[in-house]
């Protein structure tokens, strides 16, 4: 039996919500993962940070990172709940092929897509044909 893959969901909450609401959201999303058959590995409050660009009218956001393992069925309900929440302004889920350590670092390759990136026919042709300068 193979090990379940690991997932990391980073989500950003509105900066103007109360500390109790932040904890409530974090607990709700952890519970959703467990209810869907996943196992929460780690949940970290990254704090309020300035966004790289405005999201809606928000210039800051409260970052929370959720690491969990599962068979993939946890991602859909989790992201649906985040999408429907007015307090979540952005979220992203990443699947890790390697095992996650307790420190939140993956033992997977630094760039897992580098060797697995499919090329289109035009990209392969451009690599194999020599480039000549126009006359």
From Swiss-Prot:
Gene3D superfamilies: 3.30.70.60. GO terms for molecular function: small ribosomal subunit rRNA binding; structural constituent of ribosome. It comes from the Bacteria. GO terms for biological process: translation. Residues 99-120 have a biased composition (Polar residues). Belongs to the bacterial ribosomal protein bS6 family. Binds together with bS18 to 16S ribosomal RNA. This is Small ribosomal subunit protein bS6. It comes from Synechococcus sp. (strain RCC307).
